[in-house]
UniProtKB/Swiss-Prot annotation:
GO terms for molecular function: phosphate:acyl-[acyl carrier protein] acyltransferase activity. Pathway: Lipid metabolism; phospholipid metabolism. Catalyzes the reversible formation of acyl-phosphate (acyl-PO(4)) from acyl-[acyl-carrier-protein] (acyl-ACP). This enzyme utilizes acyl-ACP as fatty acyl donor, but not acyl-CoA. This is Phosphate acyltransferase. Homodimer. Probably interacts with PlsY. The keyword Cytoplasm applies. It comes from Streptococcus pyogenes serotype M18 (strain MGAS8232). Its EC number is 2.3.1.274. NCBIfam families: plsX (TIGR00182).
Amino acid sequence: MKRIAIDAMGGDNAPKAIVEGVNQAIEAFSDIEIQLYGDQTKINSYLIQSDRVAIIHTDEKIMSDDEPAKAVRRKKKASMVLAAKAVKEGKADAIISAGNTGVLLAVGLFVVGRIKGVDRPGLLSTIPTVTGLGFDMLDLGANAENTAKHLHQYAILGSFYAKNVRGIANPRVGLLNNGTEETKGDPLRKATYELLTADNTISFVGNVEARELMSGVADVIVSDGFTGNAVLKSIEGTAISIMGQLKQIINSGGIKTKIGASLLKSSLYEMKKTLDYSSAGGAVLFGLKAPVVKSHGSSDVKAIFSTIKQVRTMLDTNVVGQLVEEFAKETQVND
């Protein structure tokens, strides 16, 4: 049985969306147990009772403006912190939260702990593409500054995730840069390019420009955290703007516009599905001793369900356990 600890109080739509997502997951998957951390009364108002769902009551929760390090030290009874402690103590196998990203990163590092040999765990997310296959990108903001060694490790981590969780036999790895030529980029990108080219354990396809990301040019995209986060927000914002503008044009148009939209309904639905991040799951702080997954702050029921499904796959494939073994081998070789 896979045991998943969930911060029921994190996110814009908590606890309603969180609990209703849990209800759907419990019905869909018979091999999971959920531990919900938060206000018992509020949780119970949405929960469909099940012997595979436990509520661990606490009145304390992490706020959106809490400073990460201080919150971990001072709010020891917060729902997010208690969920992470359950993982550390072996009472749960993974943690999910839609709450404060910075605090979750701190909780992941200080409570759950990083895998020996991993210098900087990276925030990894699967982003939809026009091909429908998506790509994994990291770092998406766990670290504002990185070295070439960090980015090289992200390529290894991303490839490992793509192989074991998404089932891609030989993931193509691209380096996000301001041009495709190998001479392009700042010193960080140039040094990273050399390391990736020299590593024959990964399938490096070279530099990738931001405009190529959505076409599925690579299965894994590597970036420093600052740039990666900015690109992710741009993709999300563009997708939301496109769908919003289409809706506005259709609603404000005449009868011909509405008839045309009706005829294109299935195509527009497929387009929306392609741009919809909610079905892709959450962002994994990959490189820790257990799955620590950040669901989007505005997650709805579908997004929470998808994140639970994602974590279930991670536990089913034992991707973290395999990663621990992989880095243990590398550490022995380097020693």
